[in-house]
């Protein structure tokens, strides 16, 4: 077997059929990165019958007029656990890239390195793959691993019930505030772009990712202040009746003043205060935005295999409402009905006191660190490329 250059169409067709397909190993992503100065290189490992057994997109940049390096986003389109195939691919790839004066390529394999539950308890350990790749002369670049929250859903009801209580409460609070979610169309593109930080990038994503195998969609959350006000008027009226009833019991000398009764009255008082504050907030929003206001958005890519959440955005004014989880849930409900069962909810942030996105109760996937495949050892060491990251 040997490496050949694939046409854009050949790579497009192969990548769409591969079990490891992902939006970064795609023609669409290559075109997106061209605006950052990268040149796409599509390569495939073929046998004597010209059948493709593995392929990769390499995003190439020149170091000078002669030498170049490459970046392989989300790794090769290959079964990394088929070690003989990975070995053959690596040997042939090094030979091919040497002729093109490559110094090295940096690979971010799309491998489930470690799998944890939402409480960060280890469920699956695939760390042995690191040693196998090192045996094939891949240089391990430490401290570059990423964590994502991945959820496998079967149906709407059980998926929602499996969410942690805090997330379900957040979604319900958004409903009380009159927040609705809708899929954006062409007429809503600017509303979405106004929310994101890099408008030019997402304008290109909207334009490029229009193939059914890599399709970008965006969804927006909007507050209807009249619904917000009406919901809390109803809740105040309902809770006031409960509060009056509890108050009568506390004043009735014939009724024992138990700890439970006192606590229920205190809870009711607290709810009334909260509801009245929400009513004031809703009234202020109505005065400022009588027709409602868009407060957040989410961008996704669907590839007929999974839904990948690639962008969360919101206005600073309404950041406190935390409406993004509600958008995600509405997207998931729609996608489940369309036959999707795997949801990549995006990168999670791990700090000393918090791990984000755990409310979805999915699996935390730690993707393997980066590896450098060195083509020209002398130039690689001389220029200190091991300490650098592709821009």
Task: Describe the residue ranges of each PLM region.
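A conserved beta-strand-loop-helix scaffold within acyl/acetyltransferase catalytic domains
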Residues: 3-49, 54-65, 114, 136-143, ...
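Active-site/acyl-donor-binding loops of N-acyltransferases
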Residues: 8, 31, 119-158, 286, ...
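Acyl-donor binding region in acyl/amide transferases
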Residues: 67-141, 290-291, 304-360
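Active-site donor-binding loop signature of nucleotide-sugar glycosyltransferases
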Residues: 74, 186, 223, 362, ...
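Generic structural "secondary-structure junction" signal
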Residues: 79-80, 165, 373
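A general structural signal for short secondary-structure boundary/capping elements
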Residues: 103-105, 192-195, 343-345, 389-391
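Acidic carboxylate-rich catalytic motifs and surrounding loops in phosphoryl-/glycosyl-chemistry enzymes
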Residues: 109-110, 148, 183-187, 311, ...
């Amino acid at each position: 077997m040997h490496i050949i250059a694939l046409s854009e169409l050949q790579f497009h067709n192969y990548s769409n059929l591969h079990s490891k397909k992902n939006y970064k190993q795609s023609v669409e992503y290559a075109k997106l990165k061209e605006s950052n100065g990268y040149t796409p290189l599509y390569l495939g490992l073929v046998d004597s019958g010209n059948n493709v057994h593995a392929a990769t997109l390499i995003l190439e940049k020149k170091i000078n007029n002669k030498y170049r390096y490459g970046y392989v986003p989300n790794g090769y389109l290959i079964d990394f656990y088929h070690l003989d195939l990975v070995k053959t691919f690596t040997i042939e790839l090094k030979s091919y890239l040497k002729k093109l004066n490559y110094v090295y390529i940096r690979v971010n394999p799309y491998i489930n390195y470690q799998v944890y539950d939402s409480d960060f308890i280890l469920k699956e350990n695939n760390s042995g793959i690191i040693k196998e790749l090192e045996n094939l002369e891949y240089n391990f670049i430490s401290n570059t691993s990423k964590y994502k929250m991945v959820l496998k859903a079967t149906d709407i009801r059980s998926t929602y019930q499996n969410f942690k209580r805090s997330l379900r409460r957040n979604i319900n609070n958004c409903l009380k505030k009159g927040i609705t979610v809708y899929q954006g169309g062409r007429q809503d593109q600017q509303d979405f772009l106004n929310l994101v930080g890099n408008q030019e990038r997402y304008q290109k994503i909207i334009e490029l990712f229009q193939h059914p195998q890599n399709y970008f969609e965006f969804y927006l959350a909007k507050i209807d202040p009249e619904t917000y006000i009406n919901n809390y008027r109803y809740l105040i009226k309902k809770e006031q009746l409960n509060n009056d009833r509890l108050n009568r019991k506390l004043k009735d000398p014939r009724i024992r003043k138990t700890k439970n009764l006192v606590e229920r009255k205190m809870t009711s008082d607290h709810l009334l205060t909260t509801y009245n504050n929400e009513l004031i907030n809703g009234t202020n929003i109505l005065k400022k935005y009588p027709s409602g206001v868009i407060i957040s958005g989410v961008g996704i890519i669907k590839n007929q295999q999974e839904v990948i959440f690639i962008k969360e955005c919101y206005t600073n004014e309404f950041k406190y409402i935390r409406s993004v989880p509600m958008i995600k849930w509405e997207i998931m409900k729609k996608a489940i009905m369309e036959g999707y069962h795997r949801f990549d909810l995006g990168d999670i942030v791990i700090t000393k006191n918090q791990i984000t996105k755990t409310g979805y109760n999915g699996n935390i996937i730690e993707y393997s660190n980066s590896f450098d495949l060195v083509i020209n050892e002398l130039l690689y060491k001389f220029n200190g490329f091991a300490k650098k990251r592709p821009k």
